């Protein structure tokens, strides 16, 4: 029997045959505006509601903005932070600014992966985290793509070793076929790709699970929506991308 972590995202656990296998490190890959951050927020929030503490690593946005973004969907994490069940790791500000001085977990040099991992370990242990999201892991190797696989492997050892089930957000360009860095797809346990394609003059969101160690999963591309309550995946519908895109 596979021990699974439910994402809690409507429709997502159906195409994962029940959820992400525990301790898996999943690469959440996609272009700009595809919903990667929202997916990771929703995953952490649903964990909190199920009694699973979490950690969010902010590499691309100010921690204050992260909390605002989450609250817009009704996911106010501040009470969980006060209870010691949720933490934001500030790997964005380098500790600069008045708001940053109020953050408990600050990475003073976000380009120092070793330092980031030390602060992340502290946060995971302090809150007893079961779920972690890093947004985005690509930021750690933008200047040196050759380090992509090594960076993901380092994070995987720590995250899996500490018993967490984790999402690493990975940025790709709109036209890029890969997953956001050379070799990262081999280092991750799972890959979920989010896309945005034009259909008859409208943008359609879809996702596909490229791989997921330890479980069967849907091999089809499914449409999803972003609502005011978060992401909804439609497991019974399929998006076909060829010379033209169609939904069935």
Swiss-Prot record:
Has the keyword Magnesium been applied to this entry?
Answer: no
One GO molecular function term of this record is:
ATP binding
Q: Which keywords label this protein? A: ATP-binding, Nucleotide-binding
User: Which parts form a coiled-coil structure per UniProt?
Assistant: none
The record's annotation in CDD domains points to: KaiC_arch (cd19486)
Q: Where is the KaiC domain?
A: 3-247
Q: Which HAMAP family match?
A: UPF0273
PANTHER family given in the database record: UPF0273 PROTEIN TM_0370 (PTHR43637:SF1)
Q: Which family does it belong to?
A: Belongs to the UPF0273 family.
Q: What is this protein called?
A: UPF0273 protein APE_1505.1
This chain's source organism reads Aeropyrum pernix (strain ATCC 700893 / DSM 11879 / JCM 9820 / NBRC 100138 / K1)
